[in-house]
């Protein structure tokens, strides 16, 4: 487990990459230009800030308002958001509270979610808002993953890879720390430092900052994406798939001030039964195979164990040769 109590440096501007160009199509010169920027940013930081104009001001406002309504529901109501999968469904710990929706890019799935919370009538407005937002983030995720696989010369696996994943949309609320705990670093932790276990994560924070990312030289930096952009981040499963060519960065949420923080996350996740294994094209004398093939659910179950929680790198502890 990584240390949470290292003072962060000053705010830092991660690379900003624009995905809004209408000519951004596979095979175009603009695509190749953006693809090179994506690879450089992920090699350097494991993440980057993405501007994507399909996430309009109006859509962002609607998502923010939907989250306020959802988290105002009584706890027993929110606890109806259940899942048999680890780290899915409703979660609550200290300052952190979260709701999870599988396949929120499919409207029927979001309707099922709101029907859990409002059994009599669902909530059409919230369903449509979350569905549209998830759809747009999925479009961005697919572009990023296609660019990554092209960059490493494994484009023959693109369709197989994209079809082997599904999406989890997570709505997150971080409560401000109590007034009498201003000097207590433990109570300021909205979310402990961790690497994400999935393929790609896309995060968007609303109005209140708090996200920090650890660089490869072990420095914590405050990340402050604009309200018009999102943070795209490599997860452990992508690191394993690429035989360690990219790294998944540690990140955490530190809460200061008196405002509640809301954020959203879209997580691309390997489907049940899919084996994560590096293609032969990424294994050679200079890059020997680092990880054993594994199934994502087994990895999550390991992460829930004491050994998984205390490991400096759960991925290496679980799957490294």
UniProtKB/Swiss-Prot annotation:
Belongs to the iron/ascorbate-dependent oxidoreductase family. This is Probable 2-oxoglutarate-dependent dioxygenase AOP1.2. Its cofactor is Fe(2+). GO terms for molecular function: dioxygenase activity; metal ion binding. 2-oxoglutarate binds at residue 261. Probable 2-oxoglutarate-dependent dioxygenase that may be involved in glucosinolates biosynthesis. May play a role in the production of aliphatic glucosinolates. Fe cation binds at residues 194, 196, 251. Residues 165-270 form the Fe2OG dioxygenase domain. Binds 1 Fe(2+) ion per subunit. The keyword Ribonucleoprotein does not apply. Keywords: Dioxygenase, Iron, Metal-binding, Oxidoreductase. It comes from the Eukaryota. Its EC number is 1.14.11.-. PROSITE patterns: FE2OG_OXY. The gene is AOP1.2.
């Amino acid at each position: 487990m990584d240390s949470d109590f290292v003072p962060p440096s000053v705010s830092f501007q991660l690379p900003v990459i624009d995905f809004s160009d209408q000519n951004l199509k596979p095979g175009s010169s603009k695509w190749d230009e953006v693809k090179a920027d994506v690879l450089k940013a992920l090699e350097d930081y494991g993440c980057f800030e993405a501007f994507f104009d399909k996430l309009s001001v109006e859509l962002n406002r609607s998502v923010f308002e939907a989250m306020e309504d959802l988290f105002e529901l009584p706890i027993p109501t929110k606890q109806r958001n259940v899942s048999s999968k680890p780290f899915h469904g409703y979660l609550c710990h200290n300052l952190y509270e979260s709701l999870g929706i599988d396949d929120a890019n499919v409207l029927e799935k979001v309707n099922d979610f709101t029907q859990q919370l409002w059994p009599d009538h669902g909530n059409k407005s919230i369903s449509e808002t979350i569905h549209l937002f998830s759809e747009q983030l999925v479009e961005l995720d697919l572009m990023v993953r296609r660019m990554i696989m092209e960059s490493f010369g494994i484009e023959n696996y693109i369709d197989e890879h994209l079809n082997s994943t599904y999406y989890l949309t997570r709505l997150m609320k971080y409560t401000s720390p109590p007034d009498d705990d201003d000097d207590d670093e433990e109570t300021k932790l909205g979310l402990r430092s961790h690497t994400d276990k999935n393929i790609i994560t896309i995060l968007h924070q609303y109005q209140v900052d708090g996200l920090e990312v650890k660089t490869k030289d072990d420095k914590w930096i405050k990340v402050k994406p604009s309200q018009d952009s999102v943070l795209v981040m490599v997860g452990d499963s992508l690191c394993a798939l690429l035989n360690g060519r990219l790294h998944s960065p540690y990140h955490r949420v530190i809460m200061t001030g008196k405002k509640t923080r809301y954020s959203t996350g879209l997580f691309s996740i390997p489907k049940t039964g899919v084996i994560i294994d590096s293609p032969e094209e990424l294994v050679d004398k200079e890059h020997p195979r680092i990880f054993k093939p594994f199934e994502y659910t087994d990895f999550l179950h390991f992460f829930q164990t004491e050994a998984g929680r205390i490991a400096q790198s759960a991925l290496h502890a679980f799957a490294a040769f």
